[in-house]
Amino acid sequence: VTEAPITDLEPWQEPVRGGPSDPAAFRLSGRSQLKALRDGLLRAPANARLTGRRLTKIGRRSVTFTMPASPWLAGPKGVIHPGALVLLSDSALTGAVLTGLPPGVLFTTAELSMTFLAEMPSPGGELVARASVLHNDGRHGLAVAELRGADGEWLGFGTSRVFLQPPLDVSGLPRLGPPPPDPSWDLPDPWARPCRPSPTVVAPAATVGLEVLAQAAQGVQPRPPIDRLVGIRVTQVDRGEITFSMPASEWLTNELGMVSGGCLGLLAESATSAAGQSLARPGSGYRALDVKINFLAQVPPDGGAIIARGTAVHQGKLMVASTEVTHQGQLVAVATGSTVLGE
């Protein structure tokens, strides 16, 4: 990464790059849409420009997405945030379903589940998500994904279910033209810039517990890089309860121009695991084990706050939490997850 000028703005506050796909793409089959995205015939969505995630392989019923394990994806422990795997897996899982769809079919993600199989790696190299279709009956699609780190280590396993809509009449759509030219930017895309301050791996005693979360809410402690990348802030802290806020920014949008399920999942996972962090004893660690997110409504990029409230519902060595995600007063997602304490 080349040295770049420092900007006072957080990445999500800057003018957005990328954008939704040309509606003419719906004239193409899902597989052809994926090829157009891979080959640059469709412009990359904003969340891909933010994180560096990209489509690299298309199989008969499978896809592979990669994403740089950038320092910008580090969480409060200094390693890659587990929510980054949720963000990446959402792209791969929906892409796998898309491989078998005819022209004009839209779909929405109903549910995404992720199991984390190991402690997250330090920044460096690439994260890889390989997803394939398990089932598609024309009304529902089910896909499965495995996520690996730079050295091939297995980091996570995910599944997703989508609802398929009846095909639209695409005969009136224009033919797909070239994507709009990209403006000239003074800085590289956010994920490729130096991250200041750099993430550091810190001892559990310095990273867990209610007091540290309270310091984050008060602005006493620097926010981790991934929070600065997407705009997440801790707004309220209590023992076993945590509230995060994230702006419905254009930077978080997918190919359809809506805030992506992966970004909502990142926020939900953050609140779910932080509820466990608030219960951790001084000097002990914590590790997210899994998260399941049910998506209830789409979120437009209107700049309004997306609120995630995580609440511990069971405390022991294994902490279970639930999270409600709202936008403009509407419930848009619910999540449950477990966190092991003392690791």
Task: Give the ranges of each region predicted by the language model.
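Terminal targeting signals and extreme-terminal segments of soluble enzymes
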Residues: 1-343
